[in-house]
């Protein structure tokens, strides 16, 4: 496990210097395991600072349990935990958005808002990198999902983070580790295995992609690794596009591609009901 993570970390070149890394922790097995792994690798280094960050989207009977789990693991590792909520910043919760029954799945709204809040908070904390617990299964699902949608631009955004105005570089140390290995690590290190699934997941196409991929992996072992190997090769075919830089959103000041960030666009939809 540590060997795979170290290989990925070397490619990011983040930990070669004094650095502050914010770790997005949801309270599930992957994110708490990531925090545990990074702590075990770097706790002896005085030049590396870890901060755990949890987002409260406002999902009743689900998120409070996972935040408690995050708080427990962070306390055990003596890592500071910061909690930010949708309600405080956006004045609306994920449950409230889901109740409006938009054509888009609740996961679309929740994912965009959570990503923006993670980046905003990591930047305010002065982070050099934002680490997320996406494992091999998650990454393969995302790649396949974007193939299905024909969203090539979004595919290329999955490449290793670059220095972009207002954006904290994202790193995914677990991108080569299968979900099953993460579960084993969590069990053997007494970490949370999870608190069930988010109640809004059944309305997301990602669940269908996940089930399809698991079926393919069962019939053809190595499918998920193959998808990621192919994707990594595709990334090499397109120039990195270092000339592109986000511009501040005219509404909130957060990074955007055209002057209005996706977060504000979605919040406008919610406001208009």
Language model regions located:
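Short cysteine-rich clusters marking metal-coordination/redox-active sites
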Residues: 1, 248-252, 261-264
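Catalytic subdomain that performs nucleotidyl-dependent activation
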Residues: 124, 137-218, 223
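Cys/His-rich microdomains that often coordinate metals
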Residues: 1, 256, 268
């Amino acid at each position: 496990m540590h060997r795979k993570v170290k290989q990925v970390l070397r490619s990011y070149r983040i930990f070669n210097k004094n650095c502050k890394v914010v770790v997005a922790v949801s309270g599930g097995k992957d994110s708490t395991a990531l925090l545990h792994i990074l702590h075990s690798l770097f706790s002896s280094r005085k030049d590396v600072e870890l901060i755990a960050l949890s987002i409260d989207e406002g999902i009743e009977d689900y998120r409070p349990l996972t935040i408690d789990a995050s708080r427990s693991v962070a306390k055990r590792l003596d890592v500071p935990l910061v909690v930010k909520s949708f309600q405080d910043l956006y004045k609306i919760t994920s449950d409230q958005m889901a109740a409006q029954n938009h054509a888009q799945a609740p996961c679309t709204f929740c994912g965009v808002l959570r990503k923006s809040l993670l980046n905003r908070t990591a930047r305010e904390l002065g982070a050099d990198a934002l680490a997320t617990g996406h494992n091999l299964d998650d990454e393969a699902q995302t790649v396949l999902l974007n193939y299905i949608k024909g969203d090539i631009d979004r595919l290329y955004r999955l490449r290793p983070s670059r220095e972009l105005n207002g954006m904290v570089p994202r790193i995914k140390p677990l991108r080569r580790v299968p979900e099953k290995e993460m579960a084993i690590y969590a069990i053997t290190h007494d970490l949370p295995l999870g608190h069930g699934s988010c109640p809004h997941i059944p309305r997301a196409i990602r669940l269908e992609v996940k089930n399809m991929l698991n079926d393919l992996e069962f019939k053809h072992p190595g499918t998920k690794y193959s998808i990621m190997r192919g994707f990594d090769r595709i990334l090499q075919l397109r120039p990195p596009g270092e000339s592109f830089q986000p511009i501040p959103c005219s509404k909130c000041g957060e990074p955007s591609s055209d002057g209005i960030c996706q977060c504000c666009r979605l919040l406008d939809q919610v406001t208009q009901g």
